[in-house]
Amino acid sequence: MRKPTSSLTRRSVLGAGLGLGGALALGSTTASAASAGTTPSENPAAVRRLRALEREHQARIGVFALNLATGASLLHRAHELFPMCSVFKTLAAAAVLRDLDHDGSQLARVIRYTEADVTKSGHAPVTKDHIDTGMTIRDLCDATIRYSDNCAANLLLRELGGPTAVTRFCRSLGDPVTRLDRWEPELNSGEPDRRTDTTSPYAIARTYQRLVLGNALNRPDRALLTDWLLRNTTTLTTFRTGLPKGWTVADKSGGGDTYGTRNEAAIAWTPDGAPVLLTALTHKPSLPTAPGDTPLIIKLATVLSEAVAPA
């Protein structure tokens, strides 16, 4: 839904109910074209840029971008599988909101954990400071999405019944592809040809769309999840820097220390309020010691935004 204002803020996005009715209607009108896929001939310049980046970075790149206001789209390896990494954390928090917090009381429940939980998670910027007191489920969700805290994510998975609960959650949303099998940090291993802990650019983009712009969650839970994504801290100097100024972004990143895995899944709004799906998944199957390629993700943000929402 296009809004009359010239720019959007986090408050206006949330206060307007995320543009749900218009965005979803626009999504339905463009769904047939997007699901059919964009062939290279439909956007040859953008596809050439993606292929050049694959050669330059020795990476396999999968993208799905869709402007829900205009129908402009860009797909490249959009239905191929890629390691998911921390992009799953949005799904875990959403599953907690829908399946555990039926009456609103569970978010205030305190979860206790140990120093061993923190240590084995490999990345615990928030949970490491609350071992003595524990953390509420609400704060664990916040830490999971906004700081990509692995320990917090594992604790949410434990409450849900394990990683496969995320797979079941995705299936309930109509996503037949996305799956989670392991815990943090093992799920980030990124071995080539492994189907576990994977998604495709198209599948994860559509699932994020259902959660943020659709009716997969009730309105209060949808607003809460979107607020966490809007205030995400892990992409402020990465994916978001490659987008045009004035865009409002709700997103989650992911990555690993092997096979060059670096991912991004986002819902963005242009300054005039057009909702845009942006997903970029990257993987370097031939480079087992390669860290995640942040410069590549920044470049992909620019390619995707210019392809589907040119200035």
Swiss-Prot record:
Segment forming the signal sequence: 1-36
KW Hydrolase (keyword) present: yes
Keyword NADP: yes
Family statement: Belongs to the class-A beta-lactamase family.
Any further remark recorded for this protein: The class A beta-lactamase family has a specific amino-acid numbering system, sometimes called Ambler or ABL numbering and often misspelt as Amber. A multiple sequence alignment was used to derive a consensus sequence and then the consensus was numbered taking into account insertions and deletions. This allows use of identical numbers, e.g. for active site residues, despite differences in protein length. UniProt always uses natural numbering of residues, hence there appear to be differences in numbering between this entry and some papers.
Function of the molecule: Hydrolyzes benzylpenicillin and cloxacillin (at 10% of the rate of benzylpenicillin).
The protein, known as: Beta-lactamase
